[in-house]
């Protein structure tokens, strides 16, 4: 994304032309950026060739997942719907891992039938259910056990998953009990130790701590794991000059870990693969100036992009047509939904805007459309993928007749 003659472009496409043809709000994805992200991720960990399973929850568009599959990735899924979507996108079942704390018997049965690589179990009750279903089907099922390493990922509490108060995984004592339990099962093959400490992680040190905990527990368990699933969580820079994850140091920590563990590493990245490929184009409906606060009211809303309302997350917001006419006022960029939390960002010194002007919210490729809803009975926006000068519609705009 860059400005050419003060006009914002995504790859080789003028954003104004996109808005004119497809309307607003509209999601756009850069294929070039997607390709670069996957290439760089593989390069960062090329010394041990991990299995990279894209976290489907971050973006569930089947066309986008097909592109990700073509670039060599598998899938991490957390529901039967995501598993179906991954298979529909052509991802090899042997490159799919099924995570999540609340898999139903229907979901477990479907995963077994599809012969996916691993079901990562998160409780004794779940393992008992897997064993029961596998026994009925007369099959042996490969599973992992998700460990909760009680490691602070130094991220937002809403997206922390590796501390003892979080619902995910099992504690050390329970982990050893479950390893022992699976040793006596005729229908379960314990292949993997799984761990995932959080999302939007920008510091390598929590990963180092996590690896130390995992290493000690594996040695203590005496079990030979074929796979170590380290989850994902690698963060991206949502704001200018923000901190970036040091992949080199994380890579070194994993290489040191692998000196004593002869297992295949699995990653489950989502945000780091698709986060910065996405842009949400929106139009100014009204400019509302009050005594205490001034507002830019957009046609995009929290139902289109939930992260700011849900986490207090901030997405860089920029004008589509650049101007040197800067306002001295502070504006809050909000949507039309009847909730006070329907706001995106607050900016002082933004360029002066008028009604029908266009803005773009950046880095919305992960947990943007996948968290969207029809709240206030608003149709969901379309999704486009841009390759050079070509625009492909990968999901059409919903119509009111589809909702009413």
What is each residue range found by the language model?
Residues 65, 88, 108-113, 130-133, ...:
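Short acidic, glycine/serine/threonine-rich loops at helix termini
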Residues 60-63, 85, 152-153, 199-203, ...:
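Flexible loop/turn segments at secondary-structure boundaries
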Residues 1-141, 180-189, 216-224, 389-404:
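A charged N-terminal "starter" segment
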Residues 34, 57, 79, 111, ...:
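Conserved, mostly hydrophobic/aromatic
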Residues 19, 253, 262-404:
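Charged (often Lys/Glu-rich) extended helix/loop segments that serve as interaction or gating elements
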């Amino acid at each position: 994304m860059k400005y050419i003659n003060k006009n914002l472009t995504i790859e080789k496409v003028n954003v104004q032309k996109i808005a004119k043809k497809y309307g607003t709000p509209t999601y756009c994805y850069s294929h070039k950026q997607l390709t670069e992200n996957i290439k760089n991720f593989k390069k960062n960990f090329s010394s041990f060739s991990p299995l990279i399973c894209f976290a489907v929850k971050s973006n569930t568009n089947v066309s986008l997942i097909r592109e990700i599959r073509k670039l060599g990735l598998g899938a991490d899924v957390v529901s039967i719907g995501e598993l179906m979507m991954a298979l529909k996108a052509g991802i090899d079942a042997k490159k799919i891992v099924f995570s999540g704390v609340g898999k139903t018997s229907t979901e477990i049965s479907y995963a077994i039938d599809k012969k996916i690589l691993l079901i990562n179990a998160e409780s004794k009750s779940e393992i008992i259910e897997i064993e029961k279903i596998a026994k009925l089907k007369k099959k042996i099922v490969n599973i992992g056990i998700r460990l909760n390493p009680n490691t602070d990922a130094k991220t937002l509490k809403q997206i922390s998953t590796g501390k003892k108060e979080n619902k995910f995984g099992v504690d050390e004592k329970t982990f050893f009990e479950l390893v022992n339990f699976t040793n006596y099962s005729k229908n379960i093959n314990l292949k993997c130790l799984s761990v995932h400490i959080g999302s939007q992680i920008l510091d390598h040190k929590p990963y180092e701590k996590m690896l130390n905990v995992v290493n000690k527990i594996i040695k203590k368990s005496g079990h030979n794991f074929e796979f170590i699933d380290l989850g994902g969580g690698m963060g991206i820079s949502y704001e200018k000059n923000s901190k970036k994850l040091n992949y080199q140091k994380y890579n070194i920590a994993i290489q040191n870990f692998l000196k004593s563990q002869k297992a295949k590493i699995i990653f489950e990245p989502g945000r780091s693969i698709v986060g910065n490929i996405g842009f949400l184009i929106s139009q100014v409906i009204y400019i509302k100036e009050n005594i205490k606060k001034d507002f830019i009211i957009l046609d995009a809303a929290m139902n289109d992009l939930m992260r700011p309302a849900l986490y207090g997350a901030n997405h860089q917001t920029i004008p589509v047509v650049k101007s040197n006419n800067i306002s001295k006022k502070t504006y809050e960029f909000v949507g039309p939904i009847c909730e006070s939390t329907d706001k995106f960002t607050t900016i002082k010194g933004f360029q002066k805007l008028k009604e029908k002007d266009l803005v773009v919210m950046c880095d919305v490729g992960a947990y943007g459309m996948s968290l969207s809803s029809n709240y206030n009975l608003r149709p969901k926006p379309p999704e486009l993928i841009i390759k050079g000068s070509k625009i492909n519609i990968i999901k059409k705009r919903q119509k009111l007749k589809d909702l009413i």
